[in-house]
Regions:
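Active-site beta-strand termini and strand-to-loop segments that position acidic
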Residues: 42-43, 154-155, 343-344
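Charged/polar, solvent-exposed surface patches and flexible loops
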Residues: 21, 67, 126, 144-151, ...
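Generic alpha-helical secondary-structure signal
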Residues: 18, 68, 97, 144-145, ...
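Enzymes that bind and transform nitrogen-containing heteroaromatic metabolites
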Residues: 2-33, 49, 90, 122, ...
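Proteins enriched for Cys/Gly/acidic motifs involved in redox and nucleic-acid/cofactor modification
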Residues: 28-32, 121, 130-165
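Zn2+-dependent cytidine deaminase-like catalytic core
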Residues: 39-141, 286-288
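Short capping loops/turns at secondary-structure boundaries
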Residues: 113, 117, 153-157, 180, ...
Length: 344
């Protein structure tokens, strides 16, 4: 394949941003496969195809983008958020599809850590394509949808986000147990959109008994979103003998595990790669004690209580030097509330 002038760096960066947005749009729909985004640029550097991973067993992102581009892909560049796969599973290898389409160059963001699928970059280079791994762009409002999946491959368990809503002085409920609602409408709507991007929502039996949650993902009008995460309860208490308690979960269906470790093992084996822990305080403490929290979504409301229930129900450490620390990833204003995203 003949040499081709490199596309402008600004064009390549813009294409990567579009690919990341495409991947982010399918979070919650692809597990156990990664939510990948792909963009095809023609030989002049114009976007002619955008694709994202389809549900398991369907087309990968590169195939969707190539279908959209058609013959315009020939001599062009593929920009992908994950190294194109090089194996045949339920679908064929994306590396070979890119070669067959006449693609001249490939930019990819993350190397594929899956030993079964890796090798795409080497196969593309061996076929004469210009291949390079690029870094993530510093673009506002663009998130890397692959971070949970990458961790799940590395750790062989789902990525865990601990989510809670608290007052300015750190309480999740008043002394009498009331907590609805600490945050405002915008924050609660954001939570429902976030739930739809996860493979499972996890609560403890205490929360199941006390709050009778549905653990659904809904639109602002109350209707159910298309993607509903699995409902998971951790604890040994039997919800089926609960009488009038936990009726919503018994009506909608749920899975139950005795411990956090067994839950993550079971969920990973069944294809979950990205889970959200919503409480309560005992469960949050258990996940942190087991060093199994990878990210935190803290919704902070401009409310003061002075006393009440906290995010955790016990001390994690005896001295500050040993406390687990996270770094801030993003801060999002949601009406009068603030969502602060942290990661390890």
């Amino acid at each position: 394949m003949g040499a081709k002038p490199a596309i402008a760096e600004s064009v390549a960066r813009s294409a990567l941003v579009e690919a990341m947005r495409a991947g982010d749009s399918v979070r919650g729909l692809t597990s156990p496969n990664p939510p990948v985004g792909a963009v095809i640029l023609n030989a002049e550097g114009e976007i002619v195809g955008v694709g994202a991973t389809q549900p398991p067993g369907s087309a990968h992102a590169e195939i969707m983008a190539l279908r959209a581009a058609g013959e315009r892909a020939r001599g062009g560049t593929a920009v992908v958020t994950l190294e194109p796969c090089n194996h045949t599973g339920r679908t064929g290898p994306c590396s070979q599809a890119l070669i067959a389409a006449g693609i001249a160059a490939v930019d990819y963001l993350h190397a594929d850590p899956n030993p079964v699928a890796t090798g795409g970059a080497a196969a593309l280079a061996a076929a004469g394509l210009k291949v390079r791994q690029v870094s993530a762009p510093d673009a506002a409002g663009v998130s890397d949808a692959l971070i949970p999946w990458l961790l799940s491959v590395r750790e062989q368990r789902p990525h865990v986000t601990l989510k809670f809503a608290q007052t300015l002085d750190g309480f999740t409920a008043a002394i009498d147990g009331t907590s609805q609602w600490i945050t405002g409408t915008q924050a609660r709507q954001w939570v429902h959109a976030d739930r739809a991007r996860r493979d499972a929502i996890i609560i403890g039996t205490g929360t199941a008994f006390a709050d009778d949650p549905s653990l659904t993902a809904r639109y602002p009008d109350g209707s159910l979103r298309e993607n509903q995460p699995r409902r998971v309860v951790i604890g040994r208490r039997d919800l089926t003998a609960a009488g009038d308690v936990a009726r919503n979960l018994r009506r909608l269906g749920y899975e139950q595990y005795p411990s956090v470790e067994e839950a993550l093992v079971g969920l990973y084996a069944e294809g979950a790669r990205d889970v959200l822990v919503e409480g309560g305080a005992g469960l949050a403490s258990a996940f942190l004690e087991a060093d199994l929290v990878d990210a935190i979504s803290a919704y902070v409301a401009p409310v003061l209580l002075g006393a009440g229930r906290g995010v955790l129900d016990r001390a994690l450490v005896q001295t500050l030097a040993l406390a687990p620390r996270f770094h801030r990833v993003e801060t999002i204003a949601l009406g009068e509330d603030v969502l602060i995203e942290y990661a390890r």
